[in-house]
Swiss-Prot record:
Keyword Cell membrane: no
Pfam families reported in the protein's UniProt record: Glutaredoxin (PF00462)
MF terms in GO: glutathione disulfide oxidoreductase activity
Protein name: Glutaredoxin-C4, chloroplastic
Domain Glutaredoxin: from-to ranges: 29-129
Annotated organelle transit peptide span: 1-27
Organism, scientific name: Oryza sativa subsp. japonica
Primary role: Has a glutathione-disulfide oxidoreductase activity in the presence of NADPH and glutathione reductase. Reduces low molecular weight disulfides and proteins.
Amino acid sequence: MGMAQSSSSSSRPSDSEQLEEPSKPVMALDKAKEIVASSPVVVFSKTYCPFCARVKRLLAELAASYKAVELDVESDGSELQSALADWTGQRTVPCVFIKGKHIGGCDDTMAMHKGGNLVPLLTEAGAIATPSL
């Protein structure tokens, strides 16, 4: 019986270690979700990424307001990118959100625009001002 107690007590420290381990990813996920909730349009991006530049250029051409989070500049950018991958299943940038909903990357955003669905979604999100009549 003494052995059973020692084996169960030895498993406890590993349990507590496992509980402490995910704190950084959980914090990054919470931060990513806060960022997404803070703005109608959020683009997780990298400053040197041509696909990110293309999406940001499109949003600028559409006069859409958006928040860009440059993961290569953020001190916790790599943790944020991992958290986004866990959350959305998308590891690459740009990672676009509109009204809190994951839209996808560059190809997804461009396809949505080409299909005529992006502007209405941006307008509904309040990112594009509707002209007064």
